[in-house]
C-alpha cells in the first residue's frame, strides 16, 4: 500500500473514531440532559403539589376559622338570650314575692320560715333579723312562736335588714347563721331555671 492510501485509511479511522466519540459524548450529554430535565420536572411537580397543598391547608384553616367563629357567635347569642330570659324570670319572681308580702297568707308563710330556720339551729339563744315590713308582722306572731318552739330563747334585732323579705336567724356569736330570705330562695331556684333554659335555648 502506497503512502497516500495509508494516510487515507488512517485519516478515515481517525474520523470514524472521532465520530464515534462524538456520538458517545452526545449520547452521554443527551442522557445527562434528559435526567436533569426529568429531575427538574419532578422537582417542579413536587413544588407545584406543595403549593397546591399549602393553599388547600390555608383554605381549610380559613374555612374552619369561619365555621368556628360562626359557631361561637351563635353560642354567644344563645347564651345572651338565655341570660336575658333568666334575668326576666327572676325579676318576675322577685316582683311576685314582693306582692306576696301583702297577701293574707304571708303571715303564716313568714311564721313557717322562722320555724324552719329555728328547727335547724343548735343554739338555745337566737337572734331574729327581718326587714321593717316583716318585723311588724313578726311582732304579731312572736308570742305564738314562743309557745310552739321549746327551749329556744328568741331575741329580735331592732335594726331592720335591707332584704326583700324572709328571715335571717343566727346565734349570739354569729357563728351559726340560717338565711331564709327571698334572695336565698331566688338563688336556690336560679340554678334549676338556668338548667331548664339551657336545655330549651342552647
From Swiss-Prot:
Keywords: ATP synthesis, Hydrogen ion transport, Ion transport, Transport. It comes from the Bacteria. Pfam families: vATP-synt_E. GO terms for biological process: proton motive force-driven plasma membrane ATP synthesis. InterPro entries: ATPase_E_C (IPR038495), ATPase_V1_Esu (IPR002842). GO terms for molecular function: ATP binding; proton-transporting ATP synthase activity, rotational mechanism; proton-transporting ATPase activity, rotational mechanism. Belongs to the V-ATPase E subunit family. Produces ATP from ADP in the presence of a proton gradient across the membrane. HAMAP family: ATP_synth_E_arch. This is V-type proton ATPase subunit E. The gene is atpE.
Amino acid at each position: 500500500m502506497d503512502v497516500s492510501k495509508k494516510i487515507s485509511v488512517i485519516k478515515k479511522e481517525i474520523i470514524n473514531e472521532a465520530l464515534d466519540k462524538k456520538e458517545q459524548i452526545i449520547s452521554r450529554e443527551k442522557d445527562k440532559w434528559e435526567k436533569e430535565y426529568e429531575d427538574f420536572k419532578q422537582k417542579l411537580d413536587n413544588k407545584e403539589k406543595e403549593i397546591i397543598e399549602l393553599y388547600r391547608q390555608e383554605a381549610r384553616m380559613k374555612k374552619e376559622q369561619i365555621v368556628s367563629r360562626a359557631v361561637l357567635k351563635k353560642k354567644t347569642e344563645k347564651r345572651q338570650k338565655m341570660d336575658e330570659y333568666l334575668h326576666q324570670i327572676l325579676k318576675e319572681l322577685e316582683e311576685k314575692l314582693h306582692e306576696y308580702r301583702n297577701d293574707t297568707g304571708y303571715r303564716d308563710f313568714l311564721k313557717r320560715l322562722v320555724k324552719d330556720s329555728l328547727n335547724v339551729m343548735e343554739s338555745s339563744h337566737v337572734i331574729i333579723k327581718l326587714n321593717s315590713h316583716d318585723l311588724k308582722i313578726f311582732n304579731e306572731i312572736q308570742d305564738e312562736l314562743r309557745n310552739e318552739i321549746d327551749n329556744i330563747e328568741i331575741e329580735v334585732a331592732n335594726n331592720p335588714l335591707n332584704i326583700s323579705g324572709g328571715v335571717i336567724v343566727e346565734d349570739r356569736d354569729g357563728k351559726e347563721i340560717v338565711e331564709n330570705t327571698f334572695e336565698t330562695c331566688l338563688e336556690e331556684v336560679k340554678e334549676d331555671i338556668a338548667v331548664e333554659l339551657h336545655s330549651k335555648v342552647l
